[in-house]
Regions:
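Short beta-strand elements in bilobed, periplasmic/extracellular small-molecule ligand-binding domains
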Residues: 1-4
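Short acidic-hydrophobic catalytic motif
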Residues: 134
């Protein structure tokens, strides 16, 4: 894409995303487009306007810039790629994913996850992410 084709796209996408958050019927927002242009959206997103939305935003990879901003804003943001449901058909067949979206399945906190340590028995230290400086 040339710079000419990108002009205004971030603002347009930000307005569209805001409209999803402002729709009281919207429960879940899945971005399946990828996040190549996520940084162009971030500067135009009116976080104050959408802060009270109950909609949950799901994204992955480059979209972590938006996930981080939404989470810091008090919105629900999940680092998840919908394509995982195509790869792991058990998520759909078991009904787990449907129950989770319907609010009938409890989300597990990080300290509730079942993990096996390959080396040692605990983790300690700061957590760093690729987008920690984005917001």
């Amino acid at each position: 894409m040339t710079d000419d084709t990108l002009i205004g796209r971030g603002e347009k996408r930000a307005r569209e995303l805001e409209s999803f958050f402002l729709d009281p019927e919207m429960g879940h927002i899945f971005d399946i487009s990828g996040g190549d242009l996520a940084n162009t959206v971030l500067g135009h997103l009116d976080l104050e306007q959408i802060k009270d939305s109950q909609a949950v935003f799901y994204g992955y990879s480059d979209l972590t810039t938006i996930l981080t901003a939404l989470a810091k804003n008090g919105n629900q943001a999940v680092n998840f790629q919908l394509r995982n449901c195509l790869v792991n058909k058990d998520l759909l067949k078991s009904g787990y994913f449907d129950r989770l979206l319907a609010g009938k399945e409890k989300n597990k906190e990080l300290d509730e996850l079942e993990v096996t340590f390959v080396r040692g028995s605990k983790m300690a230290g700061p957590v760093y992410g690729a987008t920690s400086a984005a917001c």
